[in-house]
Amino acid sequence: MKGAILRTTLKSGAFDSKFLANVTGIASNINEHFGYCGFYKFAYTRNYLDAYLEAMTTLTKIEKAGVLGCCHRFYLDLEGWGGRDYTTREASEVIKGYGEAAAEMGVPFGLYANQNYILHIIDPIWSKRLYLWMARYSKTMGNTDEWEPKIWQYSSKGTVNG
């Protein structure tokens, strides 16, 4: 395993119960075999301003906890919630809000989404430009020439101690 990507906060804004302990453990073990720690936040917004504020609040909280420097990349987890999917316009607004908050905090930004979102909801301008972490639970990734994901999540069954 070369790295880990950790959930930062819950919908309430509270830290995930294992987040700080996991970040501390990872930070003390980064070496040539285990090189990075990314953070992700599931979006609960549908417009630019709310997305910007949600991301900025999360990143500020992480900074105050003293672990923002451990963040290799901050990922927006963009999936349907509240009983419906995003529209392309909503997805673009949320991506823009999160991306601008990450840039202001000096943290590289990435996008986590499933293949359906990448193909049908996310504007190609984003999927081609952003560091992409794709979920596709299959034995093969399929044709990804257009958007070239950097990370492929093919299972949700793995675990790591801690």
Residue ranges and their predicted role:
Residues 1-2, 123-162:
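Functionally critical loop-and-helix segments that line ligand-binding/catalytic clefts
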Residues 36, 105-120:
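Aromatic-lined carbohydrate-recognition surfaces of secreted/lumenal glycan-active proteins
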Residues 87-88, 120-124:
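A short secondary-structure junction signal
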Residues 19, 40-42, 112, 137, ...:
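Aromatic side chains
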Residues 1-105:
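Substrate-binding cleft of extracellular glycoside hydrolase catalytic domains
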Residues 91, 105-111, 128-136:
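Extracellular glycoside hydrolase catalytic/binding regions
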Residues 46, 82, 116, 139-141, ...:
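Residue-level detector of flexible, active-site-proximal loop/helix-junction positions
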Residues 38-40, 75, 110, 133, ...:
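Structural detector of well-ordered beta-strand residues that form the stable sheet scaffold
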